[in-house]
Amino acid sequence: MNIDLNADLGEGCASDSELLTLVSSANIACGFHAGDAQTMLTCVREALKNGVAIGAHPSFPDRDNFGRTAMVLPPETVYAQTLYQIGALGAIVQAQGGVMRHVKPHGMLYNQAAKDPHLAQAIAKAVHDYDPSLILVGLAGSELIRAGERHRLVTRQEVFADRGYQADGSLVPRMQPGALIHDEEQALAQTLDMVQAGRVKSVTGVWTTVTAQTVCIHGDGEYALAFARRLRAAFNARNVHVIA
């Protein structure tokens, strides 16, 4: 059995270099919520050195709140902003002799696109128009995945090791109880359930079916490195191969 293990990087965390030795895919911040041209270049070089698949991590323009502010923007604006960010990272990757593999939206852009078909459509169209061979990463079972499929993009359905789930398969909003899982044992058990059994237990106790093709480890998490090592060991023990 294979699984992709991804992390959001280039967001100002000191653990980026070490995480790149543990994950198979990196989602690199493109300047709208975190990062800048130099951090993008540094992350690209480190990812290439470690053989890690590179992806763009576009966001709403919200550096003050790390891309976590809900916004109501016209789809055409979201299309342009997404295209702009993908293009910026793509230029750096190309200049370093690499190939960009995927796009995964960040924060509130990701969460809103999971439920808003118009927003999802704008993102999927931007990815397709830039390079139809790129993989679109989105929340498992979401509108973003469906929009990607309509544009005939390859999609990857994502699950989260350290986030609580609602009964409908969506993430618990960050400001609500149960949104973040701080206990490593609980996060590990949830991840293994999602990957091996295709199910997740919601915060209300309801089991929900989920498709896990890629697992996200948040690079800004307090215990990201230690948890990544434990998760890799657990996968190895169960003959689950980490591969992009």
Swiss-Prot record:
- A Pfam family it matches: LamB_YcsF
Instruction: Cite the EC number.
Output: 3.5.2.9
Q: Which SUPFAM superfamilies match?
A: Glycoside hydrolase/deacetylase
Reaction(s) the record says it catalyses = 5-oxo-L-proline + ATP + 2 H2O = L-glutamate + ADP + phosphate + H(+)
**Single annotated GO MF:** ATP binding
Which keywords are on file for this protein? ATP-binding, Hydrolase, Nucleotide-binding
Q: Which InterPro entries match?
A: Glyco_hydro/deAcase_b/a-brl (IPR011330), LamB/YcsF/PxpA-like (IPR005501)
Question: What processes does the entry annotate via GO biological process terms?
Answer: carbohydrate metabolic process
What does this protein do, in the record's words?
Catalyzes the cleavage of 5-oxoproline to form L-glutamate coupled to the hydrolysis of ATP to ADP and inorganic phosphate.
Binding partners and assembly: Forms a complex composed of PxpA, PxpB and PxpC.
Entry similarity comment:
Belongs to the LamB/PxpA family.
Name recorded for this polypeptide:
5-oxoprolinase subunit A
Q: Which organism is it from?
A: Salmonella typhi
